[in-house]
């Protein structure tokens, strides 16, 4: 299966806190094409409001790149080790990262997720279906009916997450790992992309450019045009 990926540091930022995992490779910037039959493809986004987001995302991404498979238990151990690492250096205090991805292997395909990075499936070569639920205060309030879609537009804590790796406490680790049938291409994005592009814009770009590196780079360009100053990362590819 062929995968295309691109990651770009945010405007005015010193470090890219996003990490892309493509099999055994961890990517902190640039554009890449690779073939993966069995392995992990994922995006980790270091939490910008905490210390050392790039350390957290790189730590989790590196551990995943060295793994053969994913399970809730293996992710939980990575989380424990990340929290332990955060105690070593005061500059690492409460460091945290999100993570969303797919583990392809011969026996079964797994989707794993925590935070507000996203995985989509491209159905019928045209329509995106979001396979993950955002672990954010905003989404929680919307799903619980405590906030209307109209009020959500002006909600001032849209990026506040309620689950992640690290964050100084194991209570924030609420990862979801489940088996899934992937019969179509996938799209994985950090919030520097999907917070600034509508589903229609995502779909139109893929329709215009196909599943390609050009499409990945165009999504980042469009997000920038729409005001994104955040790190922006995209993976697309897989079953066609």
Q: What is each stretch, according to the model?
A:
Residues 1-240:
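PP2C/PPM-type serine/threonine phosphatase catalytic domain
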């Amino acid at each position: 299966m062929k995968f295309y990926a691109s990651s770009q540091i945010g405007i005015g930022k010193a470090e890219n806190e996003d990490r892309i995992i493509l099999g055994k490779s961890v990517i902190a910037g640039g554009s890449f094409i690779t073939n993966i039959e069995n392995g992990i493809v994922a995006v980790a986004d270091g939490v910008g409001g905490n210390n050392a987001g790039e350390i957290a995302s790189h730590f989790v991404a590196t551990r995943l790149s060295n793994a053969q498979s994913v399970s809730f238990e293996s992710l939980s151990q990575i989380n424990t080790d990340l929290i332990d690492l955060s105690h070593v250096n005061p500059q690492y205090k409460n460091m945290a990262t999100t993570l969303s991805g797919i583990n392809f292997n011969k026996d079964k395909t797994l989707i794993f997720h925590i935070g507000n990075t996203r995985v989509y499936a491209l159905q019928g070569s045209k329509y995106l279906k979001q396979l993950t639920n955002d672990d954010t205060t905003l989404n929680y309030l919307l799903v619980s009916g405590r906030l209307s879609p109209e009020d959500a537009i002006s909600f001032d804590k849209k990026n506040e997450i309620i689950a992640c790796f690290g964050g100084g406490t194991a209570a924030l680790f609420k990862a979801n790992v489940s088996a899934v049938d992937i019969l179509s291409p996938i799209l994985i994005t950090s919030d520097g992309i999907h917070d600034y592009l509508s589903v229609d814009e995502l779909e139109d770009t893929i329709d215009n450019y196909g599943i390609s590196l050009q499409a990945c780079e165009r999504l980042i360009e469009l997000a920038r045009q729409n005001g994104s100053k955040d790190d922006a990362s995209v993976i697309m590819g897989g079953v066609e």
